[in-house]
């Protein structure tokens, strides 16, 4: 097939909808720990949650997954959902919140263009919590490719944002 179509540049991903095994447990994680707000509840089967009043950034449902175990790690499916924080200070605050709750991280990386925390929700769905460095600090190769890496995140430096 010839590719003569480009998706409009203003297109954005509006939301992600996750299958979960226990709606209450997922709402506790996303709302009580991460700070999202419930915008719509669909009985005890599903919910829409949001940051900042949007109708929903994340949908959670148990329609085909109630009480089931997480998908196998070595299987096809969604790798992670990335949640963009507006500032480095905001990323530091959620790091402290996760740490105080003893919630385990699966990683913490400096990608040169961004800094990121990685974790799994209660159903094993991967999450990346990150902030982007300003674009004027991004570097490119001579051919125009963005230079990125997966370096260890300097947690001490991150925490200095809120001291």
Task: List where the protein language model places each region.
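Short histidine-centered beta-strand/loop micro-motifs
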Residues: 40-41, 70-73, 108-109
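Core segments of cupin and vicinal oxygen chelate
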Residues: 8-10, 18-63
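Acetyl-CoA-dependent GNAT
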Residues: 62-65, 132
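Vicinal oxygen chelate
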Residues: 1-7, 12-21, 69-163
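Short beta-strand/turn micro-motifs at beta-sheet edges
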Residues: 2-5, 66-71
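Histidine-centered active-site/metal-ligand motif
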Residues: 15, 55-58, 80, 111
